[in-house]
């Protein structure tokens, strides 16, 4: 699940991100987006390159790829991850990285056939500015492709323990995460559910031929939780076993929740509920009683620059 971690953290670069895409689904998208004709692609907010590394083999054989991130550390590691993933002649000279801010890219207008991002806009205080920059550097008739989640719903996904919860607890939980999300936005930390807004933003920015897809990957958990994907999904849960606050950073949650209009009393009640839920989940996992279908809403939205 793509929880609303601080974008500066590295929680979202855990192993689970390696299972984000089914290979045959990527091949289908590559076909829909006609990536075989694409000779230049820019990945904005590339992080360690998880997204563009997957798209790279589908591009035209001589295509060049530019990964951009504002953090130097990520682009250095992204370069390494391309080197590790592809034999040198494949990527040599074709893949480059640049440190730049998504809202003020140091790139000429009308440069790339495709400009894309995965979970970048959700971290921007002004996501529309980021989108406009992506469009600016796209060639006329080129495509903009954004992959962004709807994390409020992902946080509320049900599992085998949900039927034990009373309705009031679930309603409170929704209010809690809604206030958390709104507080994040108010503090300029980005909208963790921005996926829902992308089609409208694309239309407002003047893109045409807008198409919207949903990622087809789910992260199911069921006993005995044995395969590598399930282990990767559970890995953070194991790491959180030793933490007093479970998976949650109390100070961060507090900041966002209060900024979203929540009260200090509700914060403490809700935080204990979260801790209890986390402990119940761990107990159920160890007893083989926990299961979840593991769906998460992640939109892929593409549009063409006129
Ligand atoms: C959640 S990570 C996603 C990384 C990568 N796209 C992926 O899917 O694995 C968000 C990335 O956006 C970068 N980022 C956040 N704000 C940015 C900005 N204003 N300009 C450029 N990069 C930014 C972060 O440094 C981070 O690498």
Task: Name every feature range the model reports, one short phrase each.
Residues 128-143:
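A short glycine-rich, Lys/Arg-flanked "PGG" loop and its adjoining helix->strand segment in the class I
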Residues 2-12, 213-293:
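C-terminal helical/coil "lid" or tail adjacent to the Rossmann-like core of SAM-dependent
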Residues 19-39, 54:
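Conserved alpha-helix/loop element of class I SAM-dependent methyltransferases that forms part
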Residues 103-115:
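A short acidic, Gly/Pro-enriched loop at the edge of an enzyme's catalytic core
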Residues 150-247:
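Conserved catalytic/acceptor-binding region of the Class I
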Residues 146-148:
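Acidic carboxylate diad motif detector
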Residues 113-128:
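A short SAM/SAH-binding and catalytic strip from SAM-dependent methyltransferases
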Residues 40-44, 48-104:
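Class I SAM-dependent methyltransferase SAM/SAH-binding core
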